[in-house]
Amino acid sequence: MTDASVKYRPYPTINIPDRTWPGKTIDKAPIWCSVDLRDGNQSLVNPMGHDRKARMFKLLLEMGFKEIEIGFPSASQTDFDFARWCVEEGNVPDDVSLQVLVQCRPELITRTFEALEGANKPIIHFYNSTSELQRRVVFGKDVHGIKQIAVDAAKMITDMAAKAGGGFRFEYSPESFTGTELEVALEICNAVVEVVKPTADNKLILNLPSTVEMATPNIYADQIEWMCRNIDNRENVIISLHPHNDRGTGIAATELALMAGADRVEGTLFGNGERTGNVDVVTLALNMYTQGVDPELDCRDIERIKAVYEYSNEMTIPERHPYVGELVYTAFSGSHQDAINKGMKAIKVANHPVWEVPYLPIDPKDVGRSYEAIIRINSQSGKGGIAYILQQDYGINLPRNLQVEFREDIQRITDEEGVELPAKRIYERFIERYVTQPNARIKFVDHHTYPAGDFKGVRIVAAEITDNGEVKRIEGKGTGPIDGFINALSVYLGVDLSVNDYSEHSLQHGSNASAIAYVEMEHPGGKLFGAGVNTNIVAASLEAIVSAANRVLEERAK
């Protein structure tokens, strides 16, 4: 790479010693304006046709956008026709304003008014580039010449609006604002304010775009605070943001600029737009939501929003995209899985409304996602993640020591295969290894008990098992079925067996519900678990003992 200090110049800082934005927070939603159908559309490899535009437009209305930039009707017949469709057939609610973009050229302004005939409170968004670079390289004009372009357009637009009977709203953008000296931007914007003469009933939207993101977010915030302090007729001016994401900090720049006094944000769903994209209004809205602020955009069905986005834009959303990506509610790390598992249990026990789960800044259900994919299992996964999946998807609550034991089995499989294991595969492995054991030597068939003669409190357990398919009858003594069956099996197998831990729970509700029992069996070589599932809890317990005994036999045979 070439010497950066020679080729590039650092962006100058803004001198505001008494800046106030660092101590502020965002406590209310801004006015939102979607520019998906204009800025987003013009950035697509294949611009939207009518059907794709119409579907996106309907989604934006359903989400609650009150201002929607529908295109650049003077630039193409397609955009003009779509504007007419929105006006005539778009079923636009009375509280929604259609916005269109136009350059400061008389013939384009005339065509724009034609496109909006009959619209309710439409916004005419006019702009011209004001940056030092474009004044010098593109237009060859001085500040006065650039200001005159904006002033002339403002006069023509306000005159045409008055002749059309009023009802129009106005927005002006000094395009490439972040590349414009603040004093120059202020001079041009104040000249437009003087022409438009905004009132409390019809405020001027003054859009200050980060057309190209050129500096750190704090500098954009300083620029916005400076403009808010110095613009004329501030009480009747809506300060609007239009950030891009060239440096990857569009979200942060927008949030700091809102803290600096901005009232409005223009952006796109999931950040589609020129180059690296416009600011992502969905992420902005959900960031506010997770801070306890109503974003006033409906993101409850984020999968549907994603589906329309991908259909209309013919683009896919990355797996790690905030709030919507396939993997954003997923943990592979064992320690993360364990923390999520414990957090989910704690929040159920606490039964209070505040969301507090490690590694999940938002409840996935709030955006229409499920808990099913929160934890996924690969070679980095721990016992907590495996336990969570079995509990959440199949109602199996593994004892802690069994979590450790089964995790080693799953770890071996993921290490060998090098892939993620889906929940169904994990469940099937658990059932095969601990419950059905298709290749096991011993199978439980049935049992009954009867008193042990003169021994008070002791019963004889008579059980039927199969040993490699051959029916065997065994007997043992104990204080109950489990104790007696352990005694019978120990004698039959010639192995000293004892129960170190036992637990059970139901798998479903109702009179025909199955139960699962877990037995940690202690034997001369250590401890191993078994599990049994049956509609009869005693039978489930005896099956769990057989399961553990089979695993002891496997261990001894190695």
Swiss-Prot record:
CDD domains: DRE_TIM_LeuA. Mg(2+) binds at residues 39, 242, 244, 278. Pathway: Amino-acid biosynthesis; L-leucine biosynthesis; L-leucine from 3-methyl-2-oxobutanoate: step 1/4. GO terms for molecular function: 2-isopropylmalate synthase activity; acetyl-CoA C-acetyltransferase activity; magnesium ion binding. One of its GO terms (cellular component) is cytoplasm. Keywords: Amino-acid biosynthesis, Branched-chain amino acid biosynthesis, Cytoplasm, Leucine biosynthesis, Magnesium, Metal-binding, Transferase. Residues 30-303 form the Pyruvate carboxyltransferase domain. Its cofactor is Mg(2+). It comes from the Bacteria. One of its GO terms (biological process) is L-leucine biosynthetic process. It catalyses: 3-methyl-2-oxobutanoate + acetyl-CoA + H2O = (2S)-2-isopropylmalate + CoA + H(+). It is an enzyme of class 2 (transferase). Its main location: cytoplasm. Catalyzes the condensation of the acetyl group of acetyl-CoA with 3-methyl-2-oxobutanoate (2-ketoisovalerate) to form 3-carboxy-3-hydroxy-4-methylpentanoate (2-isopropylmalate). Belongs to the alpha-IPM synthase/homocitrate synthase family. LeuA type 2 subfamily. This is 2-isopropylmalate synthase.
